[in-house]
From Swiss-Prot:
Organism of provenance: Xenopus laevis (African clawed frog)
UniProt membrane topology term: Peripheral membrane protein
One term of GO molecular function: metal ion binding
Function: Mitochondrial intermembrane chaperone that participates in the import and insertion of some multi-pass transmembrane proteins into the mitochondrial inner membrane. Also required for the transfer of beta-barrel precursors from the TOM complex to the sorting and assembly machinery (SAM complex) of the outer membrane. Acts as a chaperone-like protein that protects the hydrophobic precursors from aggregation and guide them through the mitochondrial intermembrane space.
Listed GO biological process terms: protein transport
Entry protein name: Mitochondrial import inner membrane translocase subunit Tim13-B
InterPro entries attached to this UniProt entry: Tim10-like (IPR004217), Tim10-like_dom_sf (IPR035427)
Entry text on domains: The twin CX3C motif contains 4 conserved Cys residues that form 2 disulfide bonds in the mitochondrial intermembrane space. However, during the transit of timm13-B from cytoplasm into mitochondrion, the Cys residues probably coordinate zinc, thereby preventing folding and allowing its transfer across mitochondrial outer membrane.
Motif (Twin CX3C motif): 47-70
Organism domain of life: Eukaryota
Amino acid sequence: MDGFGSDFSVGGSSSGKVDTGAIMEQVKVQIAVANAQELLQRMTDKCFRKCIGKPGGSLDNSEQKCVAMCMDRYMDAWNIVSRAYNSRLQRERAKM
């Protein structure tokens, strides 16, 4: 197999037609997963750099609290920006 079509079904029809709606939905899901992974990676990197001065075998209490608070703030900020962006997109689409 070439890897591209391995996760896609052709819609279960015997006619051989590709179900483009199903493929589009799978692509959307894969993009959403990739975006979530990127968000988590960025958040982890930023909070690690901010909170962990000298990496060691374990985190002390203050580092644990810093990482937890940093991640909470990061997610809060991301949610605010995401809502504002989606709201703006909806307004722009309504103008068209």
